[in-house]
Amino acid sequence: MQHWLDKLTDLAAIQGDECILKDGLADLAEHFGFTGYAYLHIQHKHTIAVTNYHRDWRSAYFENNFDKLDPVVKRAKSRKHVFAWSGEQERSRLSKEERAFYAHAADFGIRSGITIPIKTANGSMSMFTLASERPAIDLDREIDAAAAAGAVGQLHARISFLQTTPTVEDAAWLDPKEATYLRWIAVGMTMEEVADVEGVKYNSVRVKLREAMKRFDVRSKAHLTALAIRRKLI
């Protein structure tokens, strides 16, 4: 396992674009006998993924908001420490919905795995998982927690530096009016000024932006603007 962590650290340091990084992660997973890999970054209920899991599973995961149900994500948030997991071994402790989730994942060769979560900036977290079709992960020795966190920390930095395109992410949208108003907000206008420029009432701007803030689950226009820019919605 230490050899795997060394390989991950080396991969994060290789020069190249995001395609080289994604191909390298896929090759690493295959070389060590895993079904695939998944990197998740979670910030204020917004989740993005870089993964080679099956396309249908990726779609189902995000369309059904499985990140809110996923026992692996829940455990990662609570302990921030490398761990192995198994849907079958944990079955007796799971809810009916969680058992159904694992059963669905097993259809795509995801039955067990190793996950390394780390804290990242501004209250966010990232986690890297290698998934297996085996009923459980058989570790020959305990994983070095410090080495694991260091390897994933370097991977997170590399993905952030490359501004890697997510394989999949939470659905997000702005309607045309919301996008227009928010573009003006992004360049420093007040809501009153936006209303004047667009020839609408102040309340129309306020209500539209309030609706968008509620949808994105944020409490300020500044946060909404930052999310919209980050997700290239404006």
Curated annotation (Swiss-Prot):
**SMART domains reported for this sequence:** HTH_LUXR
Q: Which domain of life is it from?
A: Bacteria
What PROSITE patterns does the database record attribute to this sequence?
HTH_LUXR_2 (PS50043)
Gene3D superfamilies, per database record:
Transcription factor LuxR-like, autoinducer-binding domain, Winged helix-like DNA-binding domain superfamily/Winged helix DNA-binding domain
Keyword Transcription carried by entry: yes
Q: What's a single GO MF annotation on this record?
A: transcription cis-regulatory region binding
Which Pfam families has this protein been placed in? Answer: Autoind_bind (PF03472)
Q: What biological processes does GO assign it? A: quorum sensing
What's a single GO CC term here? protein-DNA complex
CDD domains listed in its UniProt record = LuxR_C_like
| Feature: DNA-binding region | 191-210
Q: Which family does it belong to?
A: Belongs to the autoinducer-regulated transcriptional regulatory protein family.
Function per UniProt: Positive regulation of conjugal transfer of Ti plasmids. TraR activates target genes in the presence of AAI and also activates traR and traI themselves.
Q: What is this protein called?
A: Transcriptional activator protein TraR
Originating gene:
traR
